[in-house]
Regions:
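Conserved helicase motor core of SF1/SF2 NTP-dependent helicases
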Residues: 2-94, 98-179
Length: 179
């Protein structure tokens, strides 16, 4: 999921369709918060964004990614710091969106500015919030499914490209959860 979103973002940047890529992700995983991690903001968010970096490095040379990060052409923007922004001429990705709250999701979605595209990526089976009912991804998919210019793509175990065994694992969990 993340790889596909990053591929589209990189292609859009390289084709001149956008001026910038903005990458965001909830900074809370399994109850941990950024404030408890050592370092400055970049050092705190980097571990959370590792899957996005991995995808970027597969599509662009390392030095090119680093240069675009340094020049803010690729921006890392923790969701906690998005309030008040309008993101224009950007390709915006929200990864691990299942771990946003309803309030965070609404705030994030309303950052969309002119000539921007937004891709929200998540998996409703991997919610780390205390209550799965609080997931902004689930809430948004219910509220926005019939709005023109907003689309949803759902993937399942047939779409897994990591390893054939991963598909079998997902299938086993899906069968176990349906019983």
């Amino acid at each position: 999921k993340t790889f596909l979103a990053v591929a589209k973002a990189v292609a859009s940047l390289q084709q001149g369709l956008v001026k910038k890529i903005v990458l965001s992700r909830p900074a809370v995983e399994a109850g941990e918060k950024l404030g408890f991690l050592p370092g400055d903001l970049k050092e705190k968010v980097d571990p959370f964004l590792r899957p996005i970096y991995d995808a970027l490095y597969e599509m662009m040379p390392y030095d090119q990614v680093e240069k675009k990060l340094a020049n803010n052409i690729i921006e890392i923007a923790p969701i906690a710091f998005m309030r008040g922004r309008t993101l224009e001429d950007c390709f915006i990705i929200l990864d691990e969106a299942q771990n946003t709250t309803k309030i965070q999701m609404k705030m994030f979605l309303t950052r969309l500015g002119k000539n921007s595209k937004m891709v929200v990526v998540g998996d409703n089976t991997q919610i780390d919030l205390i209550s799965k009912n609080d997931s902004g991804l689930i809430d948004a998919s219910k509220k926005l499914k019939n709005i023109q210019d907003i689309g949803f793509i759902e993937l399942d175990q047939r779409d897994v490209i990591r390893h054939e065994v991963v598909r079998k694992i997902i299938n086993a969990y899906d069968q176990k959860n349906s019983n």
